[in-house]
């Protein structure tokens, strides 16, 4: 199992990937809002990969603004707080789009909730056409429905655009561990895992709905450190970084 893309005669890497970015990464350190320097750095990484020939679609979380489940714990209605989180993802999408355009990369934001003044509606075939033309497509507003995470959105969008793999860029962690490496210095990192191992061990790769969706459709997941320079390019090229989750639990 591999995420390695093909090289064409001109030496460029070919392949279509769905990149899932955590909203917390956009804040530059787990705070609230958007850190322009961090978003610009991410945009530069994506731009380099697109120039090298890959087709990239993006789903961004909204945790740097709102988390529906956490707001629910503070007494808010879950559905309403989830919608607030969806709107937060759109703010992140627009920030990334702005910096991609500054890098000379055409991009389109498509949202699951209609907001015609700032984004296109989510239309899968149109998204694929954009990708084929070398544009980055950024999917916002989650699934457009409460109770679905942006991890699940990323898996669903990846399948619908026929992506080769789901690349999950994490903030501050370089793969999947058997326990939290931030609190346990003895935590062991996995090089690869099967979908079943992730589910039975209850490893915090993504929510179980997303993992099950990937398992049922044999979509590989690569979990890696987002903010390490050059890591998005390494992920697309199939280099051994992070943790690869797939059918066999092996990179062979």
Swiss-Prot record:
Record-level GO BP terms: 'de novo' CTP biosynthetic process; UDP biosynthetic process
EC number: 2.7.4.22
Role: Catalyzes the reversible phosphorylation of UMP to UDP.
Highest taxon, organism lineage: Bacteria
Keywords from the named record: Allosteric enzyme, ATP-binding, Cytoplasm, Kinase, Nucleotide-binding, Pyrimidine biosynthesis, Transferase
HAMAP family given in the database record: PyrH_B
Organism: Streptomyces avermitilis (strain ATCC 31267 / DSM 46492 / JCM 5070 / NBRC 14893 / NCIMB 12804 / NRRL 8165 / MA-4680)
Involved in allosteric activation by GTP: region residues: 28-33
Name of the featured protein: Uridylate kinase
């Amino acid at each position: 199992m591999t995420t390695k893309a093909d090289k064409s005669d001109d030496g460029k890497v070919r392949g279509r990937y769905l990149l899932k970015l955590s909203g917390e990464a956009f804040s530059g350190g787990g705070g609230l809002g958007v850190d322009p320097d961090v978003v610009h750095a991410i945009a530069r990484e994506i731009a380099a990969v697109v120039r090298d020939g890959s087709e990239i679609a993006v789903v961004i979380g909204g945790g740097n603004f709102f988390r529906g489940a956490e707001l629910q714990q503070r007494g808010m209605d879950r559905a309403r707080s989830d919608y607030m989180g969806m709107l937060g993802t759109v703010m992140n999408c627009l920030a990334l789009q702005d910096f991609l355009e500054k890098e000379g990369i055409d991009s389109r934001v498509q949202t699951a909730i209609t907001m015609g003044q700032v984004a296109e509606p989510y239309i899968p075939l149109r998204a694929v056409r954009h990708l084929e033309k070398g544009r980055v497509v950024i999917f916002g507003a989650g699934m457009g429905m409460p109770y679905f995470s942006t991890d699940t959105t990323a898996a669903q969008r990846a399948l619908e655009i026929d992506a080769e793999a789901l690349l999950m860029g994490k903030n501050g962690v370089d793969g999947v561990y058997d326990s939290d490496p931030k609190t346990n210095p003895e935590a062991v990192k996995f090089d690869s895992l099967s979908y079943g191992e992730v589910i039975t061990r209850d490893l915090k790769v993504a929510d179980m709905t997303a993992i099950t969706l990937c398992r049922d459709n044999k979509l590989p997941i690569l979990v890696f450190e987002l903010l390490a320079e050059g890591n998005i390019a390494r992920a697309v090229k199939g280099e051994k970084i992070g943790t690869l989750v797939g059918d066999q639990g092996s990179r062979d």
